[in-house]
Swiss-Prot record:
Gene name as annotated: tpn50
Annotated family: Belongs to the outer membrane OOP (TC 1.B.6) superfamily.
Keywords, comma-separated and alphabetical: Cell outer membrane, Ion transport, Membrane, Porin, Signal, Transmembrane, Transmembrane beta strand, Transport
Entry's Gene Ontology cellular component terms: cell outer membrane; pore complex
Function text: Could function as a porin.
Protein name as annotated: Outer membrane protein Tpn50
Domain OmpA-like per the UniProt entry, residue ranges: 300-417
Organism encoding this protein: Treponema pallidum (strain Nichols)
Length: 417
């Protein structure tokens, strides 16, 4: 991933800050975060971003963020302290590849507490979530047109771009306005706007730490604006979706100015219960009925994986033989039974050529299969990810054509979390 395309690709992380809230059904309206131990959610966002270096367009990126959230503990209000919950979150960020698919990207874990008003208690070592204390609700009932403010912050991961090994924290004040109820598709939501401006001078005491990472490449000033629409589902007690327009300028010590601007959208999902062990048994029976001996099913760390062995790719290429599309059409019909699940397509190569060639071919093979599943309408581009494994996970010896043919395979994982 390009450094400049990844530094501030962060808006999809906002959604994890804006969920699990409760509101009364009548006006005036009281907004509070609501917690229940064992709750799980998945948040998907899509960011379209342009990156400028000294006002010259340098990079355009389309980035997806996948966030899984688990409420592991709930703390009941006591004294002046409100209710709070402990969240265990896993984040994955991915930039769209030149082959028009999203690579299975960088992973983060974060554990934090958040109280009923939305205020965070999070260790400074965690890079995610990026936007923290948004939204925070007032301690009084609100009506249409009411406004309030609260302090918040962004925590950016600048390890790749600048060698800064701790989160880069930028504080700001958010202004909120309650706009009333709106219709979004078949649902009615409470509409809240949130806006903030940033103007932050990096403390001089941090310059030395940053300079030691990469000489001449550290931020001394950060400015920017963000305008967000938050859509509150009062029945479920969640922020159901949001959109955002943002612009951030990063002034570097050497005089270079980086500008990141774009839009983001995100939705919150509560997937239906998924039993991996049972799914494996059911898919094995179905594959047997379809007479597909080259397809195997197993439970993996990421979910349920269908391994399609002996896929007929042309040697040293990602081109599928015409007969192989029929195999994929059969697999696609199986996958239609899981419309709320995301997919991970992994490509594998035989051990021929250089390691770099093996990696490239495996990525391209995964891309071919992922795009075909999109063409068949099984999944959209934002909910299927690809991964190239090179020749690192061979299932047969590579010293014969038969073994190499088995290793030229594709695996499709139904992601369980």
């Amino acid at each position: 991933m390009c450094m400049m395309g990844s530094v501030f690709s962060r808006k999809g992380m906002l959604c994890v800050l804006a969920v699990w809230c409760a509101a009364s059904a009548a006006y005036p309206l009281r907004l509070r975060y609501k917690f229940r131990k064992g709750d799980t959610h998945r948040i998907n966002s899509l960011i379209r971003e342009d990156v400028f270096v000294n006002d010259t367009l340098a990079h355009t990126a389309e980035i997806t963020n996948r966030i899984t959230v688990h409420v592991s503990e709930v703390r009941v209000a006591h004294g002046s302290a409100p209710d709070a919950a402990r969240y265990v979150c896993h984040f994955m960020t991915s930039e769209k590849s030149p082959n028009n698919t999203f690579r299975w990207g960088r992973h983060y874990e974060s554990i934090f507490w958040r109280d009923a008003f939305g205020v965070y208690d999070i260790d400074r070592s965690f890079f995610m979530p990026v936007v923290r204390n948004v939204p925070v609700f007032p301690d009084y009932d609100i009506e249409v047109g009411d406004t309030w403010e609260h302090e918040a912050e962004e925590a950016h991961d600048l390890r790749d771009g600048f060698g800064i090994q701790t989160p880069f924290i930028v504080p700001f004040t958010v202004s909120y306005t309650y706009r009333g109820e709106v219709q979004r598709g078949s649902r009615r939501y409470h509409h809240i706007t949130a806006a903030y401006s940033m103007s932050y001078e990096s403390p001089k005491r941090t310059h030395g730490v940053q300079r030691n990472a990469k000489e001449g490449m550290y931020p001394v000033r950060t400015t920017g604006v963000s305008k967000q629409n938050l859509y509150w589902d009062n029945e479920l007690g969640n922020i159901a979706e949001y959109d955002d327009e943002f612009r951030i300028l990063l002034y570097l010590s050497g005089g270079t100015v980086l500008r990141y601007q774009g839009t983001a959208t995100a939705k919150n999902f509560a997937p239906e219960r998924f039993d991996p062990a049972r799914t494996v048994v059911e898919l094995q029976e179905t594959l047997k009925d379809l007479h597909m001996p080259d397809a195997k099913v197993r439970e993996t760390e990421e979910g349920v994986t269908i391994s399609i062995e002996n896929v007929q790719f042309d040697a040293d290429s990602a081109s599928l033989a015409p007969s192989e599309y029929e195999k994929l059409r059969k697999i696609a019909e199986l996958l239609r039974a899981f419309p709320d699940r995301e997919l991970l397509v992994s490509g594998h190569a035989a051990r021929r050529g250089s390691v770099q060639d093996q990696q490239r071919i495996s990525e391209e093979r995964a891309d071919v299969v992922a795009r075909y599943l999109q063409e068949l309408g099984v999944v959209d581009a934002a909910h299927v990810y690809t991964r190239g494994c090179g020749a690192q996970q061979s299932i047969a010896p590579n010293d014969s054509e038969d073994g190499r043919r088995k290793n030229r395979r594709v695996e499709i994982t139904i992601i369980s979390k």
